[in-house]
Amino acid sequence: MFCDVQATEPDVKVSLTRVGITNLKKLIKITRESKRPIILLPTFEVFVDLPSSQKGIHMSRSPEVIEEIIESMVDNEVYGIEELSVDIIKKLFEKHEYATRAEVLMYGEYMMEEESPITKRSSQEICKIMSKAHGTKDGNNNIIIKKMVGAEVVGITACPCAQNLLKEKAIKKLKEKGFSDEDIKNILDSVSIATHNQRGIGTIMIEVPDGYEVGISKIINIIKKSMSGEVYELLKRVDEGYVVEEAHKNPKFVEDCAREMIRRVVGEFNYLPDDTEVLVRQVNKESIHRHDAFAERSSTLGELRNELK
């Protein structure tokens, strides 16, 4: 009979907050009512806590849980990634009876069809979608689970500061050449002023309370609309000119993008309770600096609603 080494006492009797597995990839099929199924190859990170009295977790049980849950998905007509995370949490507590906390993070690439803005050429767009669940178990074995879903989308931003500097420089040069104030205004209203651009990465995570639904497609659309412009895999010349011009007509700081996402989240998800947790993050990959720009807000919908009144 094999000795259960994991169940023995450790040399150093200190509890650990998270022990588990990372970088576990699995193919899953999410069935949708009256729609084509979604095929994903997500990465899983799965953790439980470990008491000070136990040497280790039973590591093989965590990937075993994921396999069992994925197999059970075949029998479900409609299944969301947040529900998948919740089922994994419940199963983790069954397999790791010593655990009082469990956590699951799932993220992967989600493929969508897109059209170029002018020529309407079709291509594939890739976004990152995410699901996170955290469960706690009390002394009476009551389990409380919080779940979140979200997405990460790439877009383009145009810097307002550099654009304003070049606008002032253009005004000065036009005045030196004898143009009137009215002519200068007409000229500047007719052309796009140059600036430097960034590849923006917007992220939104929203809690999904019991009895409510949060559409990931809505989150993706909010992120897209909150930057200076969208990016596309396939652009012909007329499309490229349009994308660049429109982005320069809509310059945004990294802070502007984050605040616009917040405004749109509050408007779109007005049916969710005030205590719903929200995370909004914007990272802009700078083109003329070696660093990146960052803005974030972690809050509840109630707090955000009060600020936007």
Curated annotation (Swiss-Prot):
Catalytic activity annotation: GTP + H2O = 7,8-dihydroneopterin 2',3'-cyclic phosphate + formate + diphosphate + H(+)
GO molecular-function term, one example from the UniProt record: iron ion binding
Pathways per UniProt: Cofactor biosynthesis; 5,6,7,8-tetrahydromethanopterin biosynthesis
InterPro entries tied to this protein: GTP_cyclohydrolase_FolE2/MptA, GTP_cyclohydrolase_MptA
Keywords of this entry: Hydrolase, Iron, Metal-binding
Cofactor: how and how many bound: Binds 1 Fe(2+) ion per subunit.
GO biological process: tetrahydromethanopterin biosynthetic process
Keyword Hydrolase: yes
Keyword Signal: no
UniProt EC number: 3.5.4.39
Cofactor requirements of the protein: Fe(2+)
May be catalytically important (site feature) positions: 159
The family this protein is said to belong to: Belongs to the GTP cyclohydrolase IV family.
HAMAP family: GTP_cyclohydrol_A (MF_01527_A)
Quaternary context: Homodimer.
Chain's role: Converts GTP to 7,8-dihydro-D-neopterin 2',3'-cyclic phosphate, the first intermediate in the biosynthesis of coenzyme methanopterin.
Name of the molecule in the record: GTP cyclohydrolase MptA
Organism from which the protein derives: Methanococcus aeolicus (strain ATCC BAA-1280 / DSM 17508 / OCM 812 / Nankai-3)
Gene that this sequence comes from: mptA
